UniProtKB/Swiss-Prot annotation:
SUPFAM superfamilies: 2Fe-2S ferredoxin-like. Its cofactor is [2Fe-2S] cluster. This is Dicamba O-demethylase, ferredoxin component. Belongs to the adrenodoxin/putidaredoxin family. GO terms for biological process: P450-containing electron transport chain. The keyword Electron transport applies. It comes from the Bacteria.
Amino acid sequence: MPQITVVNQSGEESSVEASEGRTLMEVIRDSGFDELLALCGGCCSCATCHVHIDPAFMDKLPEMSEDENDLLDSSDHRNEYSRLSCQIPVTGALEGIKVTIAQED
């Protein structure tokens, strides 16, 4: 199981184990981070699972879909490392990744 570091909106870091085959959204939400709302449950329709990805891991992620890109455009906190965590499957390649929960819009 890959270890990931989740940084909450206050800047506090926590290390959690992530089961492969799940999404980052599921792992973060199920690890007790209530500030990751994930209102749509992972259907890529709300952008409430917005995170900032460690730049060193951006090339290990699947390409961003047009739908994900459009949803992120609505965020005031979007940056070049923004992704929707519901669109990122956990794989062994994510071992050691740091994911920061974006501030709410």
